[in-house]
Amino acid sequence: MTLSGCGGNSASDAKSASGAATVKVMVGGLDKVIYLPAMLTQRLGYFKAEGLDVELLTEPAGVQAETALISGDVQGAVGFYDHTLDLQVKGKKVESVVQFSHAPGEVEVVSNRAAGSIASPKDFKGKKLGVTGLGSSTDFLTKYLAVRDGVKTSEFTPVAVGAGQTFIAALKQGSIEGGMTTDPTVATLVDQKLGKVLIDMRTPEGSQEALGGPYPSSSLYMNADWVDSHKQTVQKLVNALVKTLRWMSAHSPEEIAAKMPADYAQGGKALYAQSIRSTLPMFTKDGVMPENGPETVEKVLKAFNPNLKSAKVDLSRTFTTEFVKKVPQG
């Protein structure tokens, strides 16, 4: 299925063999619990029920999903909402059409080796800290936590280590002393006694404490022009994803885990279910942007991002609730 996000080739023109509209979506790590609604929607058959043939592709970092969207390789990206602000300042019109979460789902961990010397972000000075990729949301949030606690972004080194096994290997080898990651990586490294949790942003309370408000993170975001010219397709995508968020709110972590591909539970079924349990509080039940969420994200990004510091961001153009408000009830 080759489909370009710009030009004449579009989801409304492209049909799969079954006659369903074809949409390509790049996910910043399909096996990350923070992006779980994407694959779960596929597994529950909700995309198909809406008459869509959705191809889910994966990249280890959200920033790579953003790149695929901007280049027109895909029509949608599942990644952090904060990319929409960053892109607007760079002259790109991108908007979140459904918001999966109201907290980052991220955790700052420290290796056992470094635990004695890192008690808070004040101690980031001189340290090597893992992020999924440079320019990724983990990079953004690490920089914010440092700046908030009086450490300049030039005083520590962010290291791109991805997530999962590559993150764990970097921690084991000592090439990073800590870093920001999500479940199931967090559950695995704690279970293997390789490190401990320093800052937990998997819940709205954790987001409030670390960032001063709700931090809408994982979302489906798309080029605004594409959204405007494919409203029917976007509505179907949003219907399917919101149906999944509702399903998640009514089922146990074990029931959710059982629906996912078996290879996502690399640390075993029980540990995978535990990682879902830890991250579940971050998800919305309706896909609606949380109140004050965009403002929190703007405040966080402006604290350290020179591109955004003095820029005027039109937050109303970074997301839309047009589609989530039209999702059928029940």
Region roles according to the model:
Residues T2-G5:
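C-terminal motif of bacterial Sec signal peptides marking the signal peptidase cleavage site
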Residues N9, D13-V161, S175-D183, L198-I199:
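Short, glycine-/small- and polar/acidic-enriched structural segments
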Residues K32, E59-V63, T132, S136-S137, ...:
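Soluble non-cytosolic domains of exported or imported proteins
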Residues Y35-A38, L44, E66, Y81-T84, ...:
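Extracytoplasmic/secreted envelope proteins and their assembly/folding machinery
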Residues A49, G116, S120, R202-G213, ...:
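Short, solvent-exposed loop/beta-turn-alpha elements that line the ligand-binding surface or hinge
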Residues T166-P261:
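Pocket-lining segment of extracytoplasmic ligand-binding domains
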Residues V227-L308:
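Secondary-structure end/capping motifs
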Residues E295-G330:
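Conserved C-terminal helix/tail region of periplasmic/extracytoplasmic solute-binding proteins
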